[in-house]
Structures are given as structure tokens and as C-alpha cells.
């Protein structure tokens, strides 16, 4: 198996720490006035999502993680699993709720998602950055009612709830940023 030295560390590098795949979020080389140089890293564990700060002595090596990202198209959901299809090979993969997390509220038919695989099993699903969803429930926007925040909650066709401007009505299709869960615009 391949390994990385602390000299190879950079944000986005994936390696094994305590038997779990991790990705480097930040790293900094530190050379104190006295003592051995070290690399201060902030890592995120890909399965549990925990963020840790770990110091590695200069020259230490870590085992590379066999983690691969693939583009898949969302197909359908049954009781326990969500199914995705590879757009070129038409191979299907099933993903459980643990790997999907709370991203199920952004899945629409034929959405292009990035699935992260480790040892052949899915560990995370990243939905597209922007999705277009229909507003199925929201309060009517009253004219001149801008004393508050200027927004109102709206329930979308997938069950997600986002804050929208007062002019958005039931039945309209809106664009939502899935990374922040915020309203972007109406779709014409």
C-alpha cells in the first residue's frame, strides 16, 4: 500500500488514521526555535465526520487511503436504501442512511451526485451544488410586511425547509444551494 510523508501533506490528501479514512482540511509546517520540527494538521474523519487536530513529527509517514470519488446519477429510493446508477457503465450502487446523512432532502430524480467509496462501499454522498425544487407549502406573503427579517419558511417537494423571500408562492420552482441550504433564485 502507498504511504505519504509529512512533506507530501496538503489539503484534500486522504490517508488512514486509527483504521478510518481521513482527509486533511488544513496543514502547517512548524519549526520551533528549540526541538524537532512538526506538521500541525486539522483532519476530518470521512466516516464519522469528526474534525481533529493532530501533530505529526517531521518525516513521519501515514498509509494512503483507497478512497475514490465517482459521479453517479440518483435513481430511486426504497424502504432502507437509496439507489444510484453510474452514467457510463449503468452499474447500480445502493447507499444506506448512514452514508447519505441529511443529504436525502436534496435528492431529485436524475441528480448528478458524487459518491465516495472506500474498500468498495459508499461512505458519503455529495449532492449537486444547486438543485431546483418546487415550493409545496409556505405562508402567503403580505404586502408591506417587511418589519421582520424579510423572509419566511417554505417546505419544498423533498421535505426540506428553507427561508425564502416574501414574494415566493406555493407552486413556484426555486433554486437552492445545497451546501448552505439557502434560497438562491426563482427558476423561470
Swiss-Prot record:
Q: Name one Pfam family in it.
A: EFP_N
Q: Which UniProt keywords apply?
A: Cytoplasm, Elongation factor, Hydroxylation, Protein biosynthesis
Is Protein biosynthesis among this UniProt entry's keywords?
yes
GO annotation terms (biological process): peptide biosynthetic process
Q: In which pathway does it act?
A: Protein biosynthesis; polypeptide chain elongation
Subcellular localization(s) per the UniProt record: Cytoplasm
Q: Which SUPFAM superfamilies match?
A: Nucleic acid-binding proteins, Translation proteins SH3-like domain
Posttranslational modification, per the record? May be beta-lysylated on the epsilon-amino group of Lys-34 by the combined action of EpmA and EpmB, and then hydroxylated on the C5 position of the same residue by EpmC (if this protein is present). Lysylation is critical for the stimulatory effect of EF-P on peptide-bond formation. The lysylation moiety may extend toward the peptidyltransferase center and stabilize the terminal 3-CCA end of the tRNA. Hydroxylation of the C5 position on Lys-34 may allow additional potential stabilizing hydrogen-bond interactions with the P-tRNA.
In this chain, where does the modification N6-(3,6-diaminohexanoyl)-5-hydroxylysine occur?
34
Cellular component, GO, one term: cytoplasm
- GO molecular-function terms, A-Z: translation elongation factor activity
For the keyword Protein biosynthesis, the answer is: yes
Q: What family does the database annotate?
A: Belongs to the elongation factor P family.
Describe the task this protein carries out: Involved in peptide bond synthesis. Alleviates ribosome stalling that occurs when 3 or more consecutive Pro residues or the sequence PPG is present in a protein, possibly by augmenting the peptidyl transferase activity of the ribosome. Modification of Lys-34 is required for alleviation.
Q: What is this protein called?
A: Elongation factor P
Organism of this sequence: Actinobacillus pleuropneumoniae serotype 5b (strain L20)
Source lineage: Bacteria, Pseudomonadati, Pseudomonadota, Gammaproteobacteria, Pasteurellales
